[in-house]
Amino acid sequence: MINALIINYPWFMYLVVGLFSLAVGSLLNVIIYRLPIILQEEWKEQCCELFHFEQRKEKIKLNLFLPRSFCPHCKAMVKAWQNIPLLAILVLRGRCYQCDSPFSIRYPFVETLTTVLSLYASWHFGFTIQLLFALLAIWILISLVFIDLDHQLLPDSLTLGLLWIGLIANTQNVFVSLDVAVLSCAGAYLALWLFINLFYLMTCKVCMGHGDFKLFAAFGAWLGWMYLPIILLISSITGAIIGLIYLKINGKSRDTAIPFGPFLCISGLIAMFWGDSIINWYIGYWM
């Protein structure tokens, strides 16, 4: 029945993906905002226990689902209908109903980006098992991009989750065979680990965090070793160019830390969608 629906009414399937991804985009906004706060609270608790500090009296009681979404300015609870993606932004003209403070433009941007990438993935992969896993990867990568931009943090719950989902997908050879996925995952982590440690020995500077290792390893688990050079090359070039422009415009020193995770995420998506075309172009151009 589902196959008949896909064949006879593809527009309906795109509509389902579009509406569902809008809702997912709204959830991603919650994850992007709350997950770093939750992690920071956990780390503070662990520090208090480890060093026998007095327990903190004021604790932020927050998880990914409770309390309900609220205005970051006046803390007014968002009404149920105001959680409908994009609709509330349009009806309320992008402002809180209680204090009239403007919402961040990021909220509709994340929802729109999630929808556009999900629809493109549907067109690119078709309505197959590849699409199901690709959508999971896209949603996790969007979360990682904005969390890293805000906090220079790539949470293990997301990077390692992405890694394991990739390995699970490839137990069925969705993108590559399982043996290639496992070896590529281990090789990707080891390669970056060796490079960063050699760089530190020569310069006494840390140029990349361990979260980047895990994210790069996750791409190995998903796509195999063949795409890793593409991901590393594109992310390094774009990161260097955009980083230099950012430092120049803002008058920052060269020692200013710039998150590398967003460039890895974007490069990973490029490899997922157009990796074969890039490899074929390279072979045709040089061979």
UniProtKB/Swiss-Prot annotation:
Binding site residues for Zn(2+): 71, 74, 96, 99
Localization (cell): Cell inner membrane
Bilayer topology term: Multi-pass membrane protein
Biological-process GO terms, alphabetical: methylation; signal peptide processing
Pfam families from the UniProt entry: A24_N_bact (PF06750), Peptidase_A24 (PF01478)
Single annotated GO MF: metal ion binding
Top-level taxon of origin: Bacteria
Cofactor: Zn(2+)
Main location: membrane
Family annotation (Gene3D superfamilies): 1.20.120.1220
GO cellular component, one term: plasma membrane
UniProt keyword rRNA-binding present: no
Reactions that this protein is recorded to catalyse: Typically cleaves a -Gly-|-Phe- bond to release an N-terminal, basic peptide of 5-8 residues from type IV prepilin, and then N-methylates the new N-terminal amino group, the methyl donor being S-adenosyl-L-methionine
EC number in record: 3.4.23.43, 2.1.1.-
Bound cofactor: record note: Zinc is required for the N-terminal methylation of the mature pilin, but not for signal peptide cleavage.
Function: Plays an essential role in type IV pili and type II pseudopili formation by proteolytically removing the leader sequence from substrate proteins and subsequently monomethylating the alpha-amino group of the newly exposed N-terminal phenylalanine.
Stated name of the protein: Prepilin leader peptidase/N-methyltransferase
Species this chain originates from: Legionella pneumophila
